């Protein structure tokens, strides 16, 4: 059977459910698909189908993730749900499932628990800026004042991690009651309220095309009589012939040049857009002035940095990672976009060592500067194999 064509009529947004184990993330995911399926905007997915999420490999790390998709009147959503806590940690740090926003599920009967806090912290670190809260299991709480108390606790917790706790939409309901009575308007009302909040509170993300031009350089070659060509996949923005671009990274100084030609599949283009694999002809640049691992970018839009703070997941032995812990001053390679750069690690105060399977904040100092920004993903490698995966949380200098 041929694949269905993806109809792009509505804006697309990636979201996911986060929260403590057994607070009802998967039940809520199933409930959303059931309610929207009645309007032909989703195919109903049962709890068991989501719960036995298939294993996926992202940068060599095994992650269980379930993906469902559905629509509202205004948008198309891809929704991720992870069965285990470790899967969430890996997912959010590796960016295996990018989230534009998240639905934080908190049991009204229990209130915020340790993983509630940990998921909020992770979301703030990896750049998930928008959270909508679903207070689940409200059918198990008789006293409305208790629900109000839990709501206050959740708002305080969100504020503690830099989210606008007072403004975050909080919807109260019971996902299980929805699944048991999908025809009951009173039970399903909470799902409509939740989707309304997600539609309005989580903004449509800026498309890569609308961001400044950036292309990581994968290869460089010379065309006799024409000049130097840099090839790569355009990460964001648009490049037109005659545009001024900057070559950034690996060297202390940036170089400016003009793009005098754009080629794709040996055809000449007027312009290249995010997602295109291209060759860019650069005026007056010598072959030795540019190399893989640098980026071509809109002048002034990116800076090269040597020091940064990263949130890192360290692979377990079973995932092909290290068998032993590492200590302060560990010097692996950091793989950004297209190249490895050696860097040394300093661990947070009070942390003596890092074990395989841990996730941790670390300060890194690279030996040469790399074009980077907050939210950029990287891998940590040792002798060509990946031993960790991370995301830049703060750029220092």
Curated annotation (Swiss-Prot):
Top-level enzyme category: hydrolase
For region G2, the annotated ranges are: 60-64
Report domain tr-type G positions. 10-206
Listed binding positions for Mg(2+) are 26
**Enzymatic reactions:** GTP + H2O = GDP + phosphate + H(+)
Q: Where does GTP bind?
A: 19-26, 81-85, 136-139
Q: Which domain of life is it from?
A: Bacteria
Q: Region G5: what ranges?
A: 174-176
Residue numbers spanned by region G3:
81-84
Quote one Gene Ontology molecular function term: GTP binding
Keywords of the record, alphabetical order, are:
Cytoplasm, Elongation factor, GTP-binding, Hydrolase, Magnesium, Metal-binding, Nucleotide-binding, Protein biosynthesis
Q: Where in the cell is it found?
A: Cytoplasm
Q: Where is this region: G1?
A: 19-26
Enzyme Commission number(s) of this protein: 3.6.5.3
Q: What is its main location?
A: cytoplasm
**G4, as annotated region:** 136-139
Q: Partners and quaternary state?
A: Monomer.
Q: Which family does it belong to?
A: Belongs to the TRAFAC class translation factor GTPase superfamily. Classic translation factor GTPase family. EF-Tu/EF-1A subfamily.
User: What NCBIfam families does the entry give?
Assistant: EF-Tu, PRK00049.1, PRK12735.1, PRK12736.1, small_GTP
Its biological purpose = GTP hydrolase that promotes the GTP-dependent binding of aminoacyl-tRNA to the A-site of ribosomes during protein biosynthesis.
Q: What is this protein called?
A: Elongation factor Tu
Q: What is the species of this protein?
A: Clostridium kluyveri (strain ATCC 8527 / DSM 555 / NBRC 12016 / NCIMB 10680 / K1)
